[in-house]
Amino acid sequence: MRPRMKYSNSKISPAKCDSTSGRALVPPCKITRSQQKTKDICHVYCMRLRSGLTIRKETCYFGKEPAKRYSLKSGSKHEGRLSTCLPDSRKRSLLGSIQAFAASVDTLSIQGTSLLTESCALSTYNDQSVSFVLENGCYVINVEDCGKNQEKDKVLLRYYESSFPAQSGDGVDGKKLMVNMSPIKDTDIWLNANDKDYSVELQKGDVSPPDQAFFVLHKKSSDFVSFECKNLPGTYIGVKDNQLALVEENDESCNNIMFKLSKM
């Protein structure tokens, strides 16, 4: 008769098994939120128009910096790179923002929003300074010589996309650019083309500039541009007797309608 063998059904915990080899299980080291440093990451997208203007778009988000962690075995510290990638939803949002920015170049003129606003010094072909000066409560237009070391006054220019097709590469997406001009401190006052006496004057507006306050921008050379009246095709802002006036383009008055814009 064979003796009966007894088997134990008791379970040994994994920690006890591992202790037989001189090692104990330790929970993994986790990096707390306080250790996860964040940094501001910005992407800048620039679109350069054929007219030489550059439209700038900046998109920013927060990413995680690499954090220092300690090794369980050696106790030494080393850098581990935390994820700096955006979630898919954030990536889609960022991509959509870029696409909307690119598409906005075609739709801004429909919405009546300026593509770009900047302050520039406006000079004639003969390097005379054009300025809008407030005198006795009214703005006047001055065209005067300026010394070499004298700082030129600036005017405010807003750029728009027009409905006129570009023929000489001075537009964007086949359309010419338009501008209107204002004093720096009074943006509701616009330079207007008066078709009755062929003069140029500053007038206060209500909500949006009228057609006579828009001028189609033509790039004459790398340094000079001209301003054609939107409401009077073939008529430009020009200089007559040291004053701004409306001038029809011809060979004799070509230099009189050329102006230089400089940001200084």
Curated annotation (Swiss-Prot):
InterPro entries: IL-33 (IPR026145), IL33_C (IPR053902). It is found in: Nucleus; Chromosome; Cytoplasm; Cytoplasmic vesicle, Secretory vesicle. Residues 1-101 form a propeptide. One of its GO terms (molecular function) is interleukin-33 receptor binding. Residues 66-108 are annotated as: Interaction with RELA. Keywords: Chromosome, Cytokine, Cytoplasm, Cytoplasmic vesicle, Nucleus, Secreted, Transcription. It comes from the Eukaryota. Disulfide bonds: none annotated. The full-length protein can be released from cells and is able to signal via the IL1RL1/ST2 receptor. However, proteolytic processing by CELA1, CSTG/cathepsin G and ELANE/neutrophil elastase produces C-terminal peptides that are more active than the unprocessed full-length protein. May also be proteolytically processed by calpains. Proteolytic cleavage mediated by apoptotic caspases including CASP3 and CASP7 results in IL33 inactivation. The keyword Amino-acid biosynthesis does not apply. The homeodomain-like HTH domain mediates nuclear localization and heterochromatin association. Forms a 1:1:1 heterotrimeric complex with its primary high-affinity receptor IL1RL1 and the coreceptor IL1RAP. Interacts with cargo receptor TMED10; the interaction mediates the translocation from the cytoplasm into the ERGIC (endoplasmic reticulum-Golgi intermediate compartment) and thereby secretion. Cytokine that binds to and signals through the IL1RL1/ST2 receptor which in turn activates NF-kappa-B and MAPK signaling pathways in target cells. Involved in the maturation of Th2 cells inducing the secretion of T-helper type 2-associated cytokines. Also involved in activation of mast cells, basophils, eosinophils and natural killer cells. Acts as a chemoattractant for Th2 cells, and may function as an 'alarmin', that amplifies immune responses during tissue injury. Belongs to the IL-1 family. Highly divergent. This is Interleukin-33. The lineage of its organism: Eukaryota, Metazoa, Chordata, Craniata, Vertebrata.
